[in-house]
């Protein structure tokens, strides 16, 4: 089931600052900037395929570019795990009329 940003309350974020810096070096976006993904009214949040903790794939547009984030929820906070440019199939899902 996809969730849209308007279905969610105001978000609070947490992340590892070292991992944020590594993410910037690898993918060109840090976790401070990535929080703006939640400003996208069309943001999609889908269950990620994981076997350990519950994780979510978030697809949104920021500054005209599609991004994908992996997150987990801890109490009332969103923990950012990684953010990268969206893959073609993720872009297609975001742009599809199914949601």
Regions found by a protein language model. Give the residues of each.
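Ribonuclease/tRNase effector modules and their secretory precursors
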Residues: 1-99
């Amino acid at each position: 089931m996809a969730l849209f940003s308007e279905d969610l309350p105001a978000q609070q974020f947490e992340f590892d600052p070292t991992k944020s810096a590594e993410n910037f070096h690898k993918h060109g976006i840090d976790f401070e900037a990535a929080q703006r993904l939640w400003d996208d009214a069309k943001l999609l949040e889908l269950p990620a395929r994981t076997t350990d903790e519950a994780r979510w794939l978030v697809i949104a547009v920021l500054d005209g570019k599609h991004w994908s984030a992996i997150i987990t929820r801890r109490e009332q906070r969103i923990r950012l795990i990684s953010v990268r440019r969206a893959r073609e199939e993720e872009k297609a899902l975001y742009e599809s009329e199914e949601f």
